[in-house]
């Protein structure tokens, strides 16, 4: 019998900022790009639950979040605080949580910076697994002053849905015999891979819930969606064979930024590019890697045309100087006639490194 635990930290970035800044205690918080008085061009990384009440959510344009904040401030007399992200700090807290979890299972998958799967099958009891979940939540709060939501199920799919149902700061265990009843009333969009177009197509057929989806045969789903149809058929029945990935290999490190204003100013672009260089290299130095052999430049023009240029090196790189020199060789042709003959302004800059050797 498989017993899988899914742990999702609650409003992770915003909760860390609230913990670390006294003036944010109990306030509505948005972590993301600088809103620039409503003219910012980035997005919301995380909004805490107080901010979500007003419709602010992750991925929303920061300018839209700012407009909502101003309306709330005017009508509700409540201030929404905007905070710049500190990803280095968040990564450190994530690692602290990972160290806590290692005491509870030898098989852990770090699905993202704030999301983990643990294999608790060795306990052979959902009752014991729920006790472990409560102990994990207690220890995380004791050591990090942060809350988490936990779902437990016979597979990753069910466990993750269960954790989302009990946010924030809750836990839920779904026994194998209860899986179909648990899933039946949920909307089909809860199934991974069911996006808005797929949902619309199924809704037109009268299929709105996972229970409805079970009425369709495997052959019908495959005829409608090809190979994905087989996965939908399995998920609708609560079947998920995906394994816990103990160590997801880091394939690349990088950063990209959307500029405040489209530009072809060499001064502005080099200033921003240097900042990206430093941040990527600092992340590399904090990693378990010793060298890298490939650099990729990502560049987007004002007309949204995107260019990606990579260079692989026979001799591995490890110094900031080499990284800077080689990266500039990729960028500079786009600042003049060589690779930008139409003199198009640049909207986005990014760098990635890969092909690592470990320390």
Regions found by a protein language model. Name each.
Residues 6, 190, 198, 203-346, ...:
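DNA-contacting surface of Y-family translesion DNA polymerases
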Residues 118-137, 206:
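Catalytic palm subdomain of template-directed nucleic-acid polymerases
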């Amino acid at each position: 019998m498989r017993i899988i635990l899914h742990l999702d930290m609650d409003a992770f970035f915003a909760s860390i900022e609230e913990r670390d800044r006294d003036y944010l205690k109990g306030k509505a918080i948005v972590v993301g790009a600088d809103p620039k008085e409503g003219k910012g061009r980035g997005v919301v990384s995380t909004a805490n639950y107080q901010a979500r009440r007003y419709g602010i959510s992750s991925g929303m344009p920061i300018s839209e979040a700012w407009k909502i904040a101003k309306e709330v401030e005017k009508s509700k007399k409540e201030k929404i605080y905007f905070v710049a992200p500190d990803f280095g700090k968040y990564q450190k807290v994530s690692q602290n949580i990972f160290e806590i979890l290692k005491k509870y299972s030898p098989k852990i998958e770090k699905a993202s910076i704030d999301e983990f799967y643990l294999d608790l099958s060795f306990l052979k009891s959902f009752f014991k697994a729920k006790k472990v979940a409560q102990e994990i939540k207690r220890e995380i709060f004791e050591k990090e002053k942060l809350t988490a939501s936990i779902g437990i199920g016979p597979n990753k799919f069910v466990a993750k849905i269960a954790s989302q149902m009990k946010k924030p700061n809750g836990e839920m265990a779904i026994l194998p015999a209860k899986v179909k009843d648990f899933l039946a009333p949920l909307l089909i969009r809860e199934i991974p891979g069911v996006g808005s177009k797929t949902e619309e197509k199924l809704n037109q057929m009268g299929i709105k819930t996972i229970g409805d989806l079970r009425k369709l045969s495997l052959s019908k789903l495959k005829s409608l969606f090809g190979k994905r149809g087989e996965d939908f058929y399995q998920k609708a029945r609560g079947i998920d064979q995906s394994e816990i990935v103990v160590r997801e290999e880091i394939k690349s490190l990088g950063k990209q930024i959307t500029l405040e204003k489209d530009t072809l100013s060499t001064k502005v672009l080099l200033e921003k590019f240097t900042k990206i260089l430093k941040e990527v290299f600092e992340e590399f130095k904090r990693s378990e890697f010793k060298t890298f052999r490939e650099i990729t430049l990502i560049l987007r023009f004002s007309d949204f045309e995107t260019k990606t240029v990579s260079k692989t090196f026979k001799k591995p790189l490890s110094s900031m100087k080499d990284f800077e020199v080689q990266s500039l060789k990729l960028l500079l042709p786009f600042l003049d006639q060589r690779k930008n003959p139409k003199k198009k302004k640049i909207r986005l800059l990014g760098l990635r490194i890969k092909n690592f050797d470990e320390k």
